[in-house]
Amino acid sequence: MRTWIAILAVVLVLLLNACTDGPEDGPRLEHPDETGVLRVVTRNSATTYYLDRHERAVGPEVALVEAFADHRGWTVDWTVAATTAEVLDYLEAGAAHLAAAGLTHLDSRNQRFERGPAHTEITQQVVCHRDRTDKPRSPEDLEEVVLKVTAASSYVERLEVLAERYDALTFQEDQRGSEQLLMAVEEGRLACTVADSNIVRLNRRYLPHLDVTMDLTEGQNLGWYLAEGQERLAQQAFEWMNSRAGDEVIAAMENRYYTYVGEFDFVDLRALKRRMESRLPRYQRHFEQAEAETDMPADLLAALAYQESHWDPQARSPTGVRGMMMLTGRTAESLGVNDRLDPEQSIMGGARYLADRHERLPEHIPEPDRTFLALASYNVGRGHLLDARQLARDLGRDPDDWQEMREVLPLLSDERYYPNLRYGYARGYEPVHFVARIRNYRDVIRQAFE
């Protein structure tokens, strides 16, 4: 009797597992030409798909897929998987037409799926802090450096191969993802790490002390994979990606997400002081008027505007934001800004937006923490800040204390945490640096408003 009960229990567990979320085998998907819908599986990361501060899906893969679908007259139905393995499971089960998840084209994958077009060439790169004097420039030099790399990654496989040739080469596997390890290098907490070149390029925009010392591999292709039986769709994808229109979209994607900005002079005190003399006087009264309406301090607004545009009313970025406060068209419209290039309107719009972020935070949060959290929300989006505050509670940290939150926010890009967050992946180190720079600027700018 107990044997039959055990068998029934196993069957019940299997049935329950079959009902859980995840890919399910089923009829092959109809072609998007017939349904008008392209079903795509991806994963959360800065190089694939994430929600921006306005909770819009953005990312390199999003830009390419949406352009391809728009060219064909289709809409896109996105599924976000937790891991690369889960992405491939969805595709193998026929739950998606296409996987666009920063996938390296590999022989093993080519045997399982219909290979789609490649869009990005990468290499694995060794990255160290730029002030380090003994940077490794060759495999032999790696014997003198203890590397930390993401556990169970392609980096581990490559280093294991090299370790067979160089006996003194050592490395440690770490549960943190590439972005977390790059941040540790930036902050001087880690000597060197290894990451894909596209991840490095993207993060150097915000982590200016990273230095690529050598390539560990030759070029590898990132691209799409399609479900078995989707040969016609694969051909359409190849034709579009290799067309002039496809080339233009790839170039725009490269410019938006990967162009290296570097430090330039956003940390240059001399440049700031020059602009305080040459530019700030033209706009100071607008900051003061915005303070009168919103109660946001004029010197804080001036520091925010300097961070956003260096007080350039004609500023624009590849992402489509424009003006002194670098507002999107939709945000500007919601704030009553008719002309984003009008500095008075732009400053008032940015002040209203920051005031809204401030007012939406609990009143019990003391200053200056409430203002710092409002700035973080301004930068990364309210949804992602709410995720970070909940994560802080889960970790036993204080969500009202900025010193605590500046350590929690970067975890929004940690794959140990973001799959379980409502708004998913975010480059959580960005708001930390954003707030720090504004605080530094404000300390200098304050004298002009006293």
From Swiss-Prot:
Main subcellular localisation: membrane
GO BP, one annotated term: cell wall organization
Any Pfam family hit: SBP_bac_3
InterPro entries: Lysozyme-like_dom_sf, MltF, Solute-binding_3/MltF_N, Transglyc_AS, Transglycosylase_SLT_dom_1
Positions of the UniProt region annotated as LT domain: 262-450
Signal peptide feature range: 1-20
Gene3D superfamilies the record matches: 1.10.530.10, Periplasmic binding protein-like II
Record-level GO cellular component terms: cell outer membrane
Annotated keywords: Cell outer membrane, Cell wall biogenesis/degradation, Lyase, Membrane, Signal
CDD domains named among the record's database cross-references: MLTF-like, PBP2_YfhD_N
Compartments, record wording: Cell outer membrane
Record's catalysed reaction(s): Exolytic cleavage of the (1->4)-beta-glycosidic linkage between N-acetylmuramic acid (MurNAc) and N-acetylglucosamine (GlcNAc) residues in peptidoglycan, from either the reducing or the non-reducing ends of the peptidoglycan chains, with concomitant formation of a 1,6-anhydrobond in the MurNAc residue
UniProt enzyme class: lyase
Spans annotated as Non-LT domain: 21-261
UniProt EC number: 4.2.2.n1
Membrane topology, as annotated: Peripheral membrane protein
Active site, renumbered: E308
General function of this protein: Murein-degrading enzyme that degrades murein glycan strands and insoluble, high-molecular weight murein sacculi, with the concomitant formation of a 1,6-anhydromuramoyl product. Lytic transglycosylases (LTs) play an integral role in the metabolism of the peptidoglycan (PG) sacculus. Their lytic action creates space within the PG sacculus to allow for its expansion as well as for the insertion of various structures such as secretion systems and flagella.
Entry similarity comment: In the N-terminal section; belongs to the bacterial solute-binding protein 3 family.
Protein name: Membrane-bound lytic murein transglycosylase F 2
Originating gene: mltF2
